Amino acid sequence: CNNELTSVGGVCTVDLLTLPPLPKVVQGTTLRTMSPLAVDVERLPYPIPVAGAETTEVDMAYVPPLMLSYEIPDDIVLVDETPSVAWWDDDSSEWKTDGITDVSLKDRTLTYSTVKVTHHALVQSRVACAPYTRWSTRPSSTGESVIVSVTPKHERFGGRPIEIEVGEGVCALASDAEPALRSLLGVKLAPRKLLARLSKCGVHLALEDKDCAYVGIEKKDAALEAAMCE
């Protein structure tokens, strides 16, 4: 993604589809129109263009929005009091929030209005956890692995650290400070898979060099870092 937003809880794809012609009953006989729509569906653009007009000619300010509602998973950590929903723009390869209004979340049910019929997602800042207020490593109680502890800066975490036990080729969430993540507690996964699962839950720890610009820090010089580690 080319901006700082990342999806959490998965992606919802919204399509507007045509319905096949309805059957008619005439004198006890059911008549069905045979057309490609009888065995297939057709995706429509939104707003539906007037016959002979192009979609680009429609003033989106006057397009009635669609209201969508669905439940989000229980294992999502929401870092913002007001949730944000975005749609995926293929042209710019980024999540965008324009065209989405009236976002609300009640009892895990997400509701919003939109004029964008495409891929939607609940989104958060990819750098919400950065920079860390502190981090450390220590041996585990058995001495066979290492505990990596990071404390996110965001107030949502209340200064509580996220701890990951790192072993030979696998790692697992080792702290239960965040109730929404308890389903991952003690589950051994490859490092990349665990980081991906945490990111999907709303705790993004796999930051990249491009994310430095969003938190106002300079990225490491690779050559200097390598020299200092030798």
What role is predicted for each listed range?
Residues C1-E230:
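Proteolytic cleavage junctions
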